[in-house]
Amino acid sequence: VKDGELKILVTPSKAFGKVIKMQLRAVREAHFLTFEDVDYKGDANMVGERNWSSLIDSQQYGGPLLYPKNNQLYNWSDANNTFLASELPNGWGDYQYWGGGHAISNYLDMDLTHGDFQHQLAVYYQDAKTGFGGHNGSKNFCVHYGYADNSGYANGPLPYIYFGDGVARVVDHMYVTMTTYLANCVANGNGLTAPAGKDDWVKLVAIGYDEDGKEVATRPEFYLVGAEGNILEWTKWDLSALGKVVKIDFNVTGSNDNGYGFSQPAYFAYDDVAVRF
């Protein structure tokens, strides 16, 4: 066995001297973070329920979970499965979603006129068979919001996922796509940003940290907007180049700048995160 690959030479008795070469690839065990209730394996979550759907806020903006008045920290954990977890970072001196974070969602909206912050948790995708917005026809997914750049206006902590048990593992991949808010602004712009032109781009960046808290060498990138077009369907983002990490920060950056830094909405949706075990 070498590099995860097993080669076997087989000479069947009726092959008349021919050698049949078979190549088998060893398959690593993987656990998947799907955000679907049927796959929830943890204890009670922050609202006392044992499912993912109870972590979806009742309002996309200003709701009681992501913008609490009681200082309750929005958080989630995929305990006893991938062990991935997340909570809102302290982006603006508090722990609310306007400072960034990763929010569970099942909202979808195919109407670009709704592409604003009031609909910030909606994905711009609807499965033709199920009618749901998640990857592979599923209901639930997660929405990232937050960024940092060199403008001096956005330099707070980035939203992140981490392994709640402190064990470093390889996050193999996740599936990503646009939110309705980003899709609208890329196509039409708004009061804060121009639409994306033919040479503009928006990309996602993953920043990994090892068990010693040191950043790993490689930063995988994924272009939501770029020369090859706009990503409007769930698409695989390979994160395996990070290697074994205990934490991953995510950033959204791009070429549009309104004089105050990156001006497109710093959102993306992700689903079906694969972790090697």
Model-predicted segments: where are they?
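Short, solvent-exposed loop/turn segments enriched in Ser/Thr/Gly
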Residues: 2-7
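Short surface loop/edge beta-strand patches of beta-sandwich-type extracellular domains
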Residues: 158-164
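N-terminal targeting leaders for non-cytosolic proteins
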Residues: 29-155, 166
